[in-house]
């Protein structure tokens, strides 16, 4: 998995979604070439390592204020969309939870905010 190179980050939100824990990080310093605004890490049960990451990272080609959402999983990664909305914590979190629910087939589960 080509996971984000997080050096330091501040947890901004934490959710429970079924058997999964979702943590949204902000103020990210990384050791890769990406400029992250937010990262959602998805952990299943007691597994110490996230199995899925969703990132909002600055799109250098599209100009100021546009962020790409990148999905990173064990079998690869892909940019799945771009939006200026994802500079906002709540907009990013809502969209990331929707995507995680869809990928993991958790449509019947309600996210429970823990932080």
For every predicted segment, state its role:
Residues 6, 19, 27, 46, ...:
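Intrinsically disordered, low-complexity regions
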Residues 34-78:
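A short, structured beta-strand/loop element
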Residues 17, 22, 38-40, 55, ...:
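Intrinsically disordered, low-complexity regions enriched in small/polar residues
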Residues 1-46:
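Negatively charged, low-complexity tracts enriched in Asp/Glu with abundant Ser/Thr
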Residues 9, 53-54, 96:
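Generic hydrophobic, helix-prone segments enriched in Leu/Val/Ile
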Residues 27, 34, 54, 92, ...:
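Generic alpha-helix signal with a bias toward terminal, lower-confidence helices
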Residues 59-115:
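Mixed-charge, Lys/Arg-enriched low-complexity segments
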């Amino acid at each position: 998995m080509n996971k984000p190179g997080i050096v330091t980050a501040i947890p901004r939100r934490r959710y429970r979604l079924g058997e999964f824990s979702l943590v949204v990080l902000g103020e990210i310093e990384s050791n890769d070439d990406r400029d992250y605004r937010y990262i959602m890490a998805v952990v299943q049960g007691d597994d110490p390592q996230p199995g899925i990451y969703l990132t909002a990272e600055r799109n250098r080609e599209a100009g100021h204020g546009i962020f790409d959402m990148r999905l990173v999983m064990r079998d690869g990664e892909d940019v799945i969309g771009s939006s200026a909305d994802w500079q906002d914590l709540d907009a990013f979190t809502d969209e990331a939870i929707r995507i995680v629910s869809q990928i993991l087939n958790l449509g019947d589960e309600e996210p429970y905010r823990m932080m």
